[in-house]
UniProtKB/Swiss-Prot annotation:
Homology family: Belongs to the glutamyl-tRNA reductase family.
Pathway: Porphyrin-containing compound metabolism; protoporphyrin-IX biosynthesis; 5-aminolevulinate from L-glutamyl-tRNA(Glu): step 1/2; Porphyrin-containing compound metabolism; chlorophyll biosynthesis
GO molecular function: glutamyl-tRNA reductase activity; NADP binding
Highest taxon, organism lineage: Bacteria
UniProt keywords, alphabetically: Chlorophyll biosynthesis, NADP, Oxidoreductase, Porphyrin biosynthesis
Active site: 50 (nucleophile)
Organism listed in the record: Prochlorococcus marinus (strain NATL2A)
GO BP: chlorophyll biosynthetic process; protoporphyrinogen IX biosynthetic process
Quaternary state and interactors: Homodimer.
Residues reported to bind NADP(+): 198-203
Name the record gives this protein: Glutamyl-tRNA reductase
Keyword Transferase belongs to the record: no
């Protein structure tokens, strides 16, 4: 068995490729079912965010398992192999373990130390459990990854002052406004006519950061007005005009700055729409949706300044050097957590031998106990029989305690294999045969 991860991220693929592998809510169950049907996969879960799609799995054979997952990704995306494959990465065993720990800690994020990824890793664990696709190995790994993410944020300064995708989007708007006035600095958004399209979690974060940057009024559009009004109620200090998304054209004509973050699978704003409406001289569009809410052809329209999630790098790079230094604090913790998991993983190699040894001694115990009880005759009470049986079990447990503890203790793989060989020879254990025995139901 091998732990493997196959996927792509903002580091390996542009948004136009990533959006092809964004799994919408309605296709999550089907995706899990298709992955579970793959013979090579023993356990599996999916991490899907705006910046990454990663399949974590326990596979029988690493090469065959990775190829099977790659085939799933090709089929799901509809992309040709020569287009998708250059953007995919895969890690096995130690590298896969290290990767998920780093992802959960925010070390692999566009914004180092951002907190939202931890919630997304938690969701990956929950999805795997809900779809009954996690077994003891992957459940242990992903649960420990969540704990590692929490530990990094509580024991280091990496999470302090970390920006998110939403805050980076607001900062990008401030930066572009400053540059338009000939200044390489962030400017307040007080005078901007702002609109936010979408009322989900990312939009909530957008509103938080817009409020902190001086925005005191905006238009909020959503497919259902009630959800927009519920979100608006959480921000009483901002004057929010809630509208249905049907009013998008009107909103675009009145706004100077529009943020989009919807779950739409197709663009809701394109060049054709922008050309038709009567707009302000300059309209800034910032799209943090994946798949993209704004078509790439919007950039070709005069008076339109359009940005997507990949453009956030301009903002992130401004304070990345300082955050890289903070990331060094987390690396030691991640190495420690990886070592703990891998030691546990290695200790599993002893389980078949331990079970075989325990089974052999248990057979001897039962056989000898039966002989002894038969010699005691009918005068031996049921209570006395229980005492003798408990005594025999206690002796077996005492005999097993030291070798089992030694076999499970952290040690090199070669040392563990040597210890297992000695035990198997001394007790004449046929571990391979015991593994192939059918289980009693």
């Amino acid at each position: 068995m091998h732990i493997a991860v196959v996927g792509l991220s903002h580091r390996t693929a542009p948004v136009e490729v990533r959006e092809k592998l964004s799994i919408p809510e309605e296709l999550v169950e089907k995706s899990f079912n298709n992955l579970k049907k793959i013979d090579q996969i023993l356990e599996v879960s999916i991490l899907s965010t705006c910046n990454r799609l990663e399949i974590y799995s326990l596979v029988k054979d690493p090469q065959l398992g990775i190829e099977a997952i790659k085939s799933f990704l090709l089929q799901f995306s509809g992309l040709d192999d020569e287009i998708l494959s250059p953007h995919l990465f895969n890690y096995v065993q130690e590298k896969a373990v290290s990767h998920v720990m780093r992802v959960s800690a925010g070390l692999d994020s566009l914004v180092l130390g951002e907190g939202q990824i931890l919630s997304q890793v938690k969701k990956m664990v929950r999805l795997g459990q809900d779809h009954h696709s996690l077994g003891p190995i992957l459940n242990r790994l992903l649960t420990q990854a969540v704990s590692t993410g929490k530990r990094v944020r509580s024991e280091t300064n990496l999470g302090t002052g970390a920006v998110s995708i939403s805050s980076a989007a607001v900062e990008l708007a401030q930066l572009k406004l400053g540059q338009a006035h000939g200044r390489d600095q962030l400017m307040t958004l007080e005078t901007e006519k702002v609109a936010v399209v979408g009322a989900g979690r990312m939009s909530r974060l957008l509103l938080q950061h817009l409020q902190s940057k001086g925005c005191c009024s905006l238009t909020l559009l959503n497919r259902t007005k009630k959800r927009a009004e519920d979100l608006s109620a959480a921000f009483p200090d901002i004057q929010i005009d809630c509208q249905l998304i049907d009013e998008l054209d009107s909103c675009l004509s009145l706004s100077t700055l529009v943020f989009t973050s919807t779950a739409a699978n197709e663009p809701i704003i394109d060049a054709e729409k922008l050309i038709k409406i009567d707009r302000k001289p300059l309209l800034r569009l910032i799209d943090i949706g994946v798949p993209r809410n704004i078509s790439s052809d919007a950039k070709s329209v005069s008076g339109i300044e359009s940005h997507d999630v990949d453009d956030l790098q301009e903002v992130v790079s401004r304070n990345q050097e300082a955050r890289q230094k903070l990331a060094l604090e987390a690396e030691g913790l991640i190495e420690e957590e990886c070592r703990v998991f891998l030691e546990w993983w290695d200790s599993l190699a002893a389980v078949p031998t331990i079970n075989c040894l325990r089974s052999g001694l248990e057979s001897i115990r039962k056989e000898e106990l039966q002989k002894a009880l038969s010699r005691m005759g009918p005068d031996f009470s049921a209570r006395e029989r229980k005492v003798v049986e408990a005594l025999s079990k206690g002796i077996i447990n005492k005999i097993l305690h030291t070798p089992v503890t030694k076999l499970r203790a952290p040690q090199s793989r070669n040392d563990r294999r040597d210890s297992l060989d000695v035990i198997e020879k001394l007790f004449n254990l046929d571990v391979s045969s015991s593994l192939n025995k059918p289980k009693n139901n």
